[in-house]
From Swiss-Prot:
Binding site for S-adenosyl-L-methionine: T135, G158, D180, N227
Lineage: Bacteria, Pseudomonadati, Pseudomonadota, Alphaproteobacteria, Hyphomicrobiales
Single Gene Ontology BP annotation: methylation
Keyword vocabulary terms for this entry: Cytoplasm, Methyltransferase, S-adenosyl-L-methionine, Transferase
Entry protein name: Ribosomal protein L11 methyltransferase
Similarity field: Belongs to the methyltransferase superfamily. PrmA family.
Length: 290
């Protein structure tokens, strides 16, 4: 999908205020936001927001935010070339080891050690290569949970590349439902499941949250993993409680360290209890039981 960069210049102090406001406003969408120093002597900083889909609506929201800060800036657009940045970045990435898991691209197949569970991720347009602190944290946590609890029916909500669904399938040899709101991600997930020889265990479905008939047929789950963002995770707490089996576990990530307590509180309010937290690169992975 073609991406558009919305950008404007301002001073450093204003740029920091704007960045904080944009980050808060677009947290649910997960739109990338950046501030670049253009000229230190002249105090010129460029603020950029990267959008796809309805760019007009995003630009209007940006202008409303600027107006709310009593700032008026001409917002410019730059249409970026349609490049598969995940594919390009994977070309130079080293494999990742997280617990027993070895996540790699095709170019590193031979680097697997004896006893490791290898997951090969085809370069694609879906998030989740194992290199991000949230994904590696989830892999480590899943190994602990599966080893101790022996789940029989799992859900990977917001599957992205399906790296976590594949991890559960390989580790526990159980059926896994892998869902995502993005149909492109679902196609990538299915391809990666085939590539890793677990397609028979992983069912991939395009679904926003829990809004799909498949959940009525497959629930309750005794293991749910969701590596998305803190605010959507908090909103999903009641639905998580409605789809988890009694005594089941959920593994949550995509959460900044400063967001940890708020996420845990949302789930404690739905009769979950906190088991443990893993900290990785400023992010946390949380294990809770129902």
């Amino acid at each position: 999908m073609t991406q558009t960069r919305l950008h404007f210049t301002t001073g450093k102090i204003e740029a920091e205020r704007i960045f904080a406001a944009l980050e808060l406003a677009f947290e649910d969408e997960g739109l990338p936001i950046a501030v670049l120093e253009v000229d230190e002597d002249q105090d010129i900083h460029e603020v950029s927001l990267y959008a796809d889909g309805d760019v007009d609506t995003v630009e209007a929201r940006v202008k409303d935010i600027l107006a709310g800060l009593a700032l008026s800036k001409p917002v410019e657009r730059e249409v970026l070339p349609d490049i598969d940045w995940v594919a390009r970045s994977l070309e130079g990435l080293k494999p990742v080891r997280a617990g027993r898991f070895f996540v790699h691209g095709a170019h590193d197949r031979r680097k697997r050690h004896s006893g490791e569970l290898a997951i090969e991720i085809e370069a694609g347009l879906a998030f989740g290569t194992g290199h991000h602190g949230t994904t590696s944290g989830c892999l480590e946590m899943l190994e602990k949970v599966v080893r101790r609890e022996h789940p029989r029916n799992a859900l990977d909500l917001g599957t992205g590349s399906a790296v976590l669904a594949i991890a559960v399938a390989k580790l526990a040899h159980i059926p896994v439902l892998a869902t995502d709101i993005d149909p492109v991600a679902v196609k990538v997930a299915a391809a990666n499941a085939r590539l890793n020889h677990v397609k028979a265990l992983i069912e991939t479905v395009t679904a926003p949250g829990f809004h799909h008939p498949i959940f009525g047929r497959r629930a309750p789950f005794d293991l749910i993993v969701a590596n998305i963002l803190a605010r959507p995770l908090m909103r999903l707490a009641p639905q998580m409680a409605g789809h988890i089996a009694l005594g089941g576990s959920i593994v949550l990530s995509g959460i900044l360290e400063r967001q940890r307590d708020a996420v845990i509180s949302a789930y404690v309010g739905q009769n979950f209890r906190h088991v443990r937290t893993l900290y990785r690169e400023g992010w946390v992975t949380i294990h809770l039981k129902h």
